[in-house]
């Protein structure tokens, strides 16, 4: 499966509305136009109405609704409110700082806070690689505890299910594949593997600790005599800290030239999270991923 296949999967889910917080950005609007064309999605755009009317002048009236906002903070609040009141299905980050958007998301009155940990799931389409790779969490949780890691992994499993991988293989990553009490990542990874065996993590297969090479390469796993369903075949890479995840994320983009879609999950609705450096195509993939993930919230 490739990221472009998400377009077909998302297009099955008709009449989804995406609320875009502070959509005053040409690349964001390009992605909005592509999504309106290919996904039959509708958009609620918050921001300066004059600028947004100019940017969306070529779109049909039924495809877009514009809600005026004077500041990024107001834009974020209005977009989140629309999802909170179920007039939109998905929230999308526009030209607004992530911290501002998340402040609105976590508002106790009209936000999207749930009992779950919020976490970031990135889905990579890597050239010459035979499957999509899910990486979590490279953007939200700095140094998650064991219980937070369990929830982060479970969030990623829900996203994998949403795109059609019904039993993903998850590798709890560390620097080495043996347990070392002085290396917390190896201890947590081993605990997660045991939690899976005891039924505390569902909908996937978990192993760890695994180093990156023997998680994704069957050759590397065989050389180190590491066996099991996950070794060499991982779909989900659960990183121990935000530093490890962020470096892996950017390495895949800048060195491996991977395409990426990203979503924040664990809230009451999925959040398509894109960076300003993302192309319109990658933003489109994130919208498609969030639409697919939104179906998990209805079941």
Curated annotation (Swiss-Prot):
Catalyzes the conversion of butyryl-CoA through butyryl phosphate to butyrate. One of its GO terms (biological process) is butyrate metabolic process. The keyword Cell division does not apply. It catalyses: butanoyl-CoA + phosphate = butanoyl phosphate + CoA. The lineage of its organism: Bacteria, Bacillati, Bacillota, Bacilli, Bacillales. It comes from the Bacteria. It comes from Bacillus subtilis (strain 168). Coiled coil: none annotated. The keyword Mitochondrion does not apply. The gene is yqiS. SUPFAM superfamilies: Isocitrate/Isopropylmalate dehydrogenase-like. GO terms for molecular function: phosphate butyryltransferase activity. This is Probable phosphate butyryltransferase.
């Amino acid at each position: 499966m490739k990221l472009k296949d998400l377009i077909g999967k998302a297009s099955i889910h008709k009449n989804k509305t995406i609320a875009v917080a502070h959509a005053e950005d040409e690349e964001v609007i390009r992605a909005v136009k592509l999504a309106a064309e290919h996904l039959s999605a509708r958009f609620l755009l918050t921001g300066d109405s004059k600028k947004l009317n100019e940017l969306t002048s070529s779109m049909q009236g039924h495809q877009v609704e514009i809600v005026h906002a004077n500041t990024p903070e107001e834009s974020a609040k209005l977009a989140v409110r629309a999802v909170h009141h179920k007039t939109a299905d998905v929230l999308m980050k526009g030209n607004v700082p992530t911290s501002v958007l998340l402040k609105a998301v976590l508002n106790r009155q009209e936000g999207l806070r749930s009992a779950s940990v919020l976490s970031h799931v990135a889905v990579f389409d890597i050239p010459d690689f035979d499957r999509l790779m899910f990486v979590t969490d490279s953007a939200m949780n700095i140094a998650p505890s064991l219980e937070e890691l369990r929830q982060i992994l479970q969030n990623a499993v829900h996203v994998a299910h949403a795109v059609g991988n019904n039993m993903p293989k998850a590798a709890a990553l560390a620097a080495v594949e043996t347990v070392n009490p002085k290396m917390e990542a190896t201890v947590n990874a081993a605990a997660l593997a045991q939690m899976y065996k005891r039924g505390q993590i569902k909908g996937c297969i978990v192993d760890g600790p695994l180093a990156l090479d023997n998680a994704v390469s069957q050759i590397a796993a065989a050389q180190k005599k590491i066996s099991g369903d996950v070794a060499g075949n991982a779909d989900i890479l659960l990183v121990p800290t935000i530093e490890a995840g962020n470096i892996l994320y950017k390495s895949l983009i800048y060195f491996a030239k991977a395409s990426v879609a990203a979503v924040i999950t664990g809230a009451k609705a999925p959040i398509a999270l894109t960076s300003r450096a993302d192309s319109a195509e990658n933003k489109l993939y994130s919208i498609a991923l969030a639409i697919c993930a939104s179906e998990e919230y209805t079941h």
